Structures are given as C-alpha cells and as structure tokens.
C-alpha cells in the first residue's frame, strides 16, 4: 500500500496523466538481473530517441493512469508487452508522464515470459512496435 500511495501522491502533486513507479530512481529493493537491466536501458534509449523524454523504467507496469491516459489506452493499448510502446503513444498525444521512485520485491512465483531465446523475439517485437507507434496516427 505504501508504494501505491506514492503514485497517488505524485498524481495529486503534479497532475501528470501517467505516473510510473520506477525501480531505478533510488535503486532500492529488487533491481533485476544484469541482462534484463541492459534490455531496460536499451528501451530507455529508444524511448528517449522517439519521445525526447528520459523515462528510466520503461518496462514498469506499476502505473497510475489519469482519465486522459485511460481514454487513450482504451483505444490504442497494445496487447503484447505494452509498457515501452504505450509510453510512446502517451507522449505523442501530449500526455504528461512522471516517474516516482518505488521499492519493488522479487517475483514470488511463476516465471517470466521473457527468457532464453524469447528475449530476442521480445526485443525485436517491442522495437518494431515502438517505431510503428511513433509513426502511427493517433
């Protein structure tokens, strides 16, 4: 609950349309593997090129969406691996995006759908989808 409150407080303080709970701003809590961090840094770089915004945790699904973002997401939210791609169309639509530091814990169960050979597929798919979101009419 404390981490959710950080997102709610940021929304009240900033009136941002999208609030992202970021693992990497304060580097507290679970930080994921080195290889996964490289992938996240790649999507940070790609997002920065396409949107001119520096969002450090582009793969975080811990988000709070305001009404404008919800309306846009209802029409355009990707089915597969939506986190990096959605930031591009939120940015293109002129929505305000804010990151706040949160503490996340390691996965308690289950397995990531992105492991082994599927990592290459994921990176390729999200890169192409992000570029298409950049040129797509919103």
Q: What does each of the following model-derived ranges do?
A:
Residues 1-80, 107-124, 128:
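Acceptor/aglycone-binding surface of glycosyltransferases and processive sugar-polymer synthases
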Residues 53-54, 75-78, 87-105:
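Catalytic donor-sugar/metal-binding loop of nucleotide-sugar-dependent glycosyltransferases
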Residues 84:
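DNA-recognition element of transcription regulators
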Residues 125-138:
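C-terminal, non-catalytic tails of nucleotide-sugar-dependent glycosyltransferases
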């Amino acid at each position: 609950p404390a981490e959710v409150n950080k997102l709610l407080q940021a929304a009240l303080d900033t009136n941002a349309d999208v609030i992202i709970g970021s693992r990497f701003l304060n580097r507290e809590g679970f930080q994921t593997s080195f290889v996964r961090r490289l992938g996240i840094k790649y999507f940070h770089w790609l997002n920065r090129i396409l949107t001119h915004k520096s969002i450090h945790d582009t793969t975080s699904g811990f988000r709070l969406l305001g009404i404008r973002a919800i309306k846009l997401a209802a029409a355009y939210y990707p089915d597969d691996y939506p986190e990096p791609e959605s930031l591009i169309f939120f940015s293109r639509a002129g929505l305000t995006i804010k990151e706040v530091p949160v503490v996340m814990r390691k996965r308690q169960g289950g397995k990531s759908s992105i492991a082994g050979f599927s990592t290459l597929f994921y990176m390729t798919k999200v890169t192409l989808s992000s570029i298409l979101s950049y040129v797509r009419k919103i």
